[in-house]
């Protein structure tokens, strides 16, 4: 009888557990109560799922001890483009000398992974390995990696996070020339030899889409090339916004594939994995009842995601791109197509926001045309009814976020690209850099962003079977933000720009810590954040 009673109790507990699991709901919009956090924790993602944080070299290291890169050149030449505060990455978090504090904070978070990048010009100051390697740069990364491994934090290393050595840009315009393939390959070969015994997860290029579009179509990012009439203030040092983005993207894919082939051919014995990182967005029809808007959203998917994913899976560009772009779109030779197709063990996907899509005439050819116009799509953050997809993402950019977008993007990649192994390599939100220390630390907006996206991430894994193995919050700490300087903060830890040794977990960092530990609790509710309490009263309640 006791045995039967015991079995019945076990059954009831199991049933209750399953029921609780099935009843997980995710809020799509404010208020994000995150009421499901008692069952939404790291424990619900599997014991081998990696939860970490991310950063990049130019944004955190500072310029000490390395060669000049294109962001140095760009930010000094066009300071107004590098941030409205006219700041740059010359001095940022100074992680080059304060990396021990970074590792200490990751240990405090109980993070199990850290995605960071090598500064190419810190290891190879003049761009080409044949011109010399800086031992101090190698030692810096060895020390960092060793410290991570001591704390059981898995390193994910990005080889190129947009900071190309300036010498290669000066000599042959960087990714505009195929010479970059060999130089990138030589640099990667050095890194595999030097660090491959410790690093088992390699990323070739961060956000393949970004450098071609922002660096060569709009000129808003390094190296700052565009057609003369695209930047009316004449702040591009040359370029063709209609053709160069496609050439740069093509050479990036060829360089990526060459490096993956090198790793698989010469370093398979290291038992690691390698892949690229994509920036992703979800595109909703501006008017869901209008077939033209539905078609525009899918066309945008092809120009935004398919531009890289079709070559990486099939060895060719999307049919719609070949049809619209025509001769401006390079072709792969048969050998190149074979090399590019399948050149990844995993995909890193960065996700931040969702936008609405509606058709817009493509003005090509014209003096103000850019490759971004070829899709013939106008992107907005409001739909035909004037509705926004979710809460404010960045006040200065009038942008909004949509947590369920991460669900749709992951399902899209699973369905369209044969359910690849995926890591979420960036996901986060900015807060104003003008906030006081107390306001910056009490970042409940970031908690709501993180927990709402993690909820939908778990939901898509469970409901759709998407093969996601890790999540990296952006960012480890406040840092220099490309094109915004220090006017925004993305960190889970606070950095005092007047005293760089002053670094502490924000409320979001403490929440993420509890989430990783499996003890996450509800964040402070939105109604408190919007309450009529005076600023002093709020500070007192928050113990600032």
From Swiss-Prot:
The keyword Chloroplast does not apply. The active site is at 426 (nucleophile). Keywords: Disulfide bond, Glycoprotein, Glycosidase, Hydrolase, Metal-binding, Signal, Vacuole, Zinc. Binds 1 ascorbate molecule per subunit. One of its GO terms (molecular function) is thioglucosidase activity. Glycans are attached at residues 110, 240, 331, 382, 517. Its EC number is 3.2.1.147. L-ascorbate binds at residues 207, 281. It is an enzyme of class 3 (hydrolase). Substrate binds at residues 59, 161, 206, 426, 481. It is found in: Vacuole. It catalyses: a thioglucoside + H2O = a sugar + a thiol. In vacuoles called myrosin grains of a certain class of cells, myrosin cells, distributed in the cotyledons and the axis of the embryo as well as in different organs of the growing plant. Residues 1-20 form the signal peptide. It comes from the Eukaryota. GO terms for biological process: carbohydrate metabolic process. Its cofactor is L-ascorbate. Its main location: other. SUPFAM superfamilies: (Trans)glycosidases (SSF51445). Disulfide bonds join 26-455, 34-451, 226-236. PANTHER family: GLYCOSYL HYDROLASE (PTHR10353), THIOGLUCOSIDASE (PTHR10353:SF231). Belongs to the glycosyl hydrolase 1 family. Degradation of glucosinolates (glucose residue linked by a thioglucoside bound to an amino acid derivative) to glucose, sulfate and any of the products: thiocyanates, isothiocyanates, nitriles, epithionitriles or oxazolidine-2-thiones. Homodimer. It seems that the absence of a catalytic proton donor in plant myrosinases is not impairing the hydrolysis of glucosinolates. This is Myrosinase MB3. The lineage of its organism: Eukaryota, Viridiplantae, Streptophyta, Embryophyta, Tracheophyta.
């Amino acid at each position: 009888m006791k045995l039967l009673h015991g079995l019945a109790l076990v059954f009831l507990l199991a049933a209750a557990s399953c029921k609780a699991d099935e009843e997980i709901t995710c809020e799509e919009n404010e208020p994000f109560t995150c009421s499901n956090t008692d069952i939404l924790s790291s424990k619900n993602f599997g014991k081998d799922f990696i939860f970490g944080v991310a950063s990049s070299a130019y944004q955190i290291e500072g310029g000490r001890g390395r060669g000049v890169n294109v962001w140095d050149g760009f930010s000094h030449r066009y300071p107004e483009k590098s941030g409205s505060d006219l700041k740059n990455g010359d001095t940022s978090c100074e992680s080059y000398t304060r990396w021990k504090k970074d590792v200490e904070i990751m240990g405090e978070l109980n993070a199990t992974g850290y995605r960071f990048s090598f500064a190419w010009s810190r290891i190879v100051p003049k761009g080409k390995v044949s011109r010399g390697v800086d031992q101090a740069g190698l030692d810096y990364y060895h020390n960092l990696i060793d410290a991570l491994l001591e704390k059981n934090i898995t390193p994910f290393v990005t080889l190129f996070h947009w900071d190309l050595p300036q010498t290669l840009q000066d000599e042959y315009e960087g990714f505009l020339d195929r010479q970059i393939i060999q130089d990138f390959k030589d640099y990667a070969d050095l890194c595999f030899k030097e660090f491959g015994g410790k690093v088992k997860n390699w990323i070739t290029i961060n956000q393949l889409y970004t450098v071609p579009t922002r660096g060569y179509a709009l000129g808003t990012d390094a190296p700052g090339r565009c057609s003369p009439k695209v930047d009316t203030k004449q702040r591009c040092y040359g370029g063709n916004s209609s053709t160069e983005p496609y050439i740069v993207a093509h050479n990036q894919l060829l360089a990526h594939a060459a490096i993956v082939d090198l790793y698989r051919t010469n370093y398979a014995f290291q038992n690691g994995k390698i892949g690229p990182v994509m920036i992703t967005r979800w595109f909703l029809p501006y008017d869901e009842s209008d077939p033209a808007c539905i078609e525009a959203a899918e066309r945008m998917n092809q120009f935004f995601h398919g531009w890289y994913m079709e070559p990486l899976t099939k060895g060719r560009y999307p049919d719609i791109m070949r049809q619209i772009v025509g001769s401006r779109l390079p072709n792969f030779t048969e050998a190149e197509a074979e090399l590019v197709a399948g050149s990844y063990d995993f995909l890193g996907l960065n996700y931040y926001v969702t936008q609405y899509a509606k058709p817009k005439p493509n003005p090509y050819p014209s003096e103000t045309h850019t490759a971004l116009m070829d899709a013939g799509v106008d992107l907005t953050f409001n739909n035909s009814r004037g509705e926004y997809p979710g809460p404010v993402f960045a006040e200065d950019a009038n942008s909004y976020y949509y947590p369920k977008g991460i669900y749709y993007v992951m399902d899209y990649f699973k369905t369209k690209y044969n359910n690849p192994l995926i890591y979420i390599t960036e996901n986060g939100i900015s807060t104003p850099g003008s906030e006081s220390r107390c306001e910056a630390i009490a970042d409940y907006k970031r908690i709501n962003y993180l927990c709402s996206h993690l909820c939908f991430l778990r939901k898509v894994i469970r409901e759709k079977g998407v093969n996601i193995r890790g999540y990296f919050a952006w960012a480890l700490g406040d840092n220099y933000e490309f094109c915004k300087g220090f006017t925004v903060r993305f960190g889970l830890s606070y950095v005092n720009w007047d005293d760089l040794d002053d670094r502490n977990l924000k409320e979001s960092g403490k929440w993420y810590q509890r989430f990783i530990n499996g003890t996450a609790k509800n964040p402070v509710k939105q109604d408190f954040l919007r309450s009529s309490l005076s600023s002093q009263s709020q500070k007192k309640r928050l113990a600032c």
